[in-house]
């Protein structure tokens, strides 16, 4: 019975989180992010501002959460779903490219690129892939009991953040009169280039895991 109560409680919390982030995005698209208050989001989701603060620390965090929509879990699941004979570096690159370059709603992308605060928050969310990705990498390496998977996951997250930063905040990014940053370059190419720098470390970790299995 306790397990069932815990499951129902978690489902309710997740439903509240989804309601808040969807309300935040809906209001931001309608009014512009600068014209949305936390109280507005809470009211639209049918909860109190205090409840809102249990889930998100800012309006930007809620808006970006709606745009990314559990991406960290999807990246890890995608890595775990790759066949065992697929090279680890390839499995990671395929999963990252799949989840970060999927077709986006034009209005949502415009919302992110038009706001410096939303751009920064969007980049900060990349760190959320570390924990689930470390678990997926550790599973593929055969549960080594070492920090290897965590170090690799942190490195992948850093590479993804740098690629996104280059895409969203290039040094000479053209600006519109409203301050809108126009993304430049190919995001898939930027991601591939950043992740390629990690291939030697990923290959070495995978080779060590295979050697342990052969012993």
Q: Where is each model-derived feature located?
A:
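Hydrophobic alpha-helical bundle segments that form small-molecule/ligand-binding pockets
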Residues: 101, 127-153, 170
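C-terminal peripheral helix-coil segments that are non-catalytic and often amphipathic
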Residues: 135, 169-215
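HTH DNA-binding helix-turn interface
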Residues: 7, 31-33, 46, 53-64
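Hydrophobic alpha-helical connector segments
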Residues: 73-108
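Basic, helix-initiating cap at the start of DNA-binding domains
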Residues: 1-31, 35-44, 74
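Short secondary-structure transition hinges
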Residues: 73, 103-132, 138
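Amphipathic alpha-helical segments enriched in hydrophobic/aromatic and basic residues
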Residues: 28, 37, 59-67, 71, ...
């Amino acid at each position: 019975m306790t397990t069932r109560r815990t499951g129902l409680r978690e489902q309710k919390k997740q439903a509240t989180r989804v309601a808040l982030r969807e309300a935040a995005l809906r209001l931001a698209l309608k009014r512009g992010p600068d014209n949305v208050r936390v109280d507005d989001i809470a009211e639209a989701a049918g909860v109190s501002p205090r409840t809102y603060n249990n889930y998100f620390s800012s309006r930007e965090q809620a808006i970006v959460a709606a745009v990314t929509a559990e991406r960290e879990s999807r990246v890890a699941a995608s890595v775990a779903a790759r066949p065992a004979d697929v090279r680890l570096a390839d499995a990671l690159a395929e999963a990252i490219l799949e989840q970060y370059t999927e077709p986006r709603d034009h209005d949502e992308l415009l919302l992110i690129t038009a706001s410096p605060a939303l751009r920064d928050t969007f980049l900060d969310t990349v760190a959320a892939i570390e924990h689930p990705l470390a678990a997926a990498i550790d599973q593929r390496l055969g549960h080594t009991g070492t920090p290897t998977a965590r170090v690799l996951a942190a490195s992948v997250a850093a590479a993804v953040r740098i690629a996104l930063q280059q895409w969203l905040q290039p040094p000479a990014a053209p600006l519109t009169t409203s301050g809108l940053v126009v993304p430049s370059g190919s995001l898939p190419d930027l991601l591939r280039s950043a992740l390629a720098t990690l291939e030697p470390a990923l290959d070495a970790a995978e080779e060590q895991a295979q050697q342990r299995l052969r012993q």
